[in-house]
């Protein structure tokens, strides 16, 4: 079975004509629907791309806002820590100053108490000495002294003791 050139050309023309008729029929009856489907799909893809871009921009804005909030929180936490350190330092300094003042006050009170005790002891010694002096003087003189003479004698005796 051999095919001649004429048959080949005839088949070619027949197939080409059939394809052209088929394309014309598709264009007349189905092309509008196919074009509509392709247009709808193109619009859907375009909307999806736009939504993806909007979502990306929204995510970037949200990320920037979150980062700004995080930075503000870090700054606020740092300020709180700094303020707490400063307050702690001030309170520590205040406590040290109060303790120093209290120590000075206690030292001054102790010195005052020592001076008072010393004065009381000297006064007690003077009184004791005056009594002894009076007794000694009475024995030596053989007579009782009145208060004025007693005071003068005591003062004189104490002055002599103070110089010694």
From Swiss-Prot:
MF-aspect GO terms: proton-transporting ATP synthase activity, rotational mechanism; proton-transporting ATPase activity, rotational mechanism
Pfam families the record matches: ATP-synt_B (PF00430)
GO cellular component entries: plasma membrane; proton-transporting ATP synthase complex
Keywords (A to Z) from UniProt: ATP synthesis, Cell membrane, CF(0), Hydrogen ion transport, Ion transport, Membrane, Transmembrane, Transmembrane helix, Transport
Coiled coil (residue ranges): none
Transmembrane segments: 6-26
Record keyword rRNA-binding present: no
Subcellular location: Cell membrane
Bilayer topology: Single-pass membrane protein
Matches recorded under NCBIfam families: ATP_synt_b
Record HAMAP family: ATP_synth_b_bprime
Family membership noted in the UniProt record: Belongs to the ATPase B chain family.
Role played: F(1)F(0) ATP synthase produces ATP from ADP in the presence of a proton or sodium gradient. F-type ATPases consist of two structural domains, F(1) containing the extramembraneous catalytic core and F(0) containing the membrane proton channel, linked together by a central stalk and a peripheral stalk. During catalysis, ATP synthesis in the catalytic domain of F(1) is coupled via a rotary mechanism of the central stalk subunits to proton translocation.
The protein's name: ATP synthase subunit b
Species the sequence originates in: Streptococcus pyogenes serotype M1
Gene that encodes it: atpF
């Amino acid at each position: 079975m051999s095919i001649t050139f004429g048959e080949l050309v005839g088949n070619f023309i027949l197939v080409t004509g059939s394809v052209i008729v088929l394309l014309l029929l598709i264009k007349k009856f189905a092309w509008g629907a196919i074009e509509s489907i392709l247009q709808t799909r193109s619009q859907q893809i375009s909307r999806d791309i736009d939504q993806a871009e909007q979502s990306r921009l929204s995510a970037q804005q949200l990320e920037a806002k979150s980062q700004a909030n995080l930075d503000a929180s870090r700054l606020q936490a740092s300020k709180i820590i700094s303020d707490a350190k400063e307050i702690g330092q001030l309170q520590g300094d205040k406590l040290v100053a109060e303790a120093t003042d209290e120590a000075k006050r206690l030292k001054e009170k102790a010195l005052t108490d020592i001076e008072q005790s010393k004065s009381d002891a000297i006064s007690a010694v003077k009184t004791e000495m005056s009594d002894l002096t009076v007794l000694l003087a009475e024995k030596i003189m053989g007579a009782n002294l009145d208060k004025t003479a007693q005071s003068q004698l005591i003062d004189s005796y104490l002055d002599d003791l103070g110089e010694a």
